[in-house]
């Protein structure tokens, strides 16, 4: 089975876009007067504020948009994870990876995640102690974070700090689900699991704790993750989705796709039942963006994608130090310094991570 839907560089570019969105979102939404996102729960009040800033824009409109929409970088990562698992473990290759049992598979991916988590979390703990207003960690929550089961505990949004590290618990759950239920199984099972996870959420109170807890776990991430698996299993998709230059798809079709996706993302965000499917158009729009990028821009975001894992664990550390500039001085001054330092510090963190031996399957 051959799938040329996304090249390696395009996947890396999508990671670059995703981590930039997440990094900027996690700074902007900490500024008190900025519009808040609907990530785990659906608050009508947040949409009302979004509508207000869209209809009465001011100088802070980009910050509002990054705060509200930036978290959708997470579904892009989930899509790429599902896509990558199929390409690595289900696609014939001259040098196929070793196939261990389910326990070996989960252990291998847990250790890969732990390499990132242990570096970022350790540095963050030191910084958090030194900076005023530190978070009160409890030993049992630290253990839960390191073992990546903290997502299943009550009120995860109040015990996971920094908040973005919830992603590690989500990923280990999705690895378990993939290996036990979806690995080399018929694609109908992927579709069925997506539908089941949607049904478990759709009847919840939009602002309730039940929905919050579901979306902190694999149930909330199954849609983009499952789409990645499905897209990777379509062998002829790449024939219609080549990068511009192959002439397989006219450039105007990508432009139309990007514009339509953007319209759907904004419109569907205002209704509870359509809100669940916004990640679909986020993914489609991101793919279209990558396909449209000129070479020089693709090279930049591809490089950002190459350090995205390090940036993921590093940016909360930099935010902890620089968020006070946005609180006390100018928002854009703080944002610019935050971005520059985050990129530089992420490169340093990557060097530390690379010194830790990689696990073997």
Each model region followed by its residue ranges:
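Membrane-cytosol interface segments of multi-pass membrane proteins
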Residues: 1-197, 239-249, 327-361
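Aromatic-anchored segments of alpha-helical transmembrane domains
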Residues: 20-27, 146-152, 194-207, 257-270, ...
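Hydrophobic alpha-helical segments of integral membrane proteins
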Residues: 85-86, 124, 201, 205, ...
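Hydrophobic alpha-helical transmembrane segments
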Residues: 127-129, 178-182, 204-205, 262-271, ...
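Alpha-helical transmembrane segments of multi-pass integral membrane proteins
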Residues: 225, 255-357
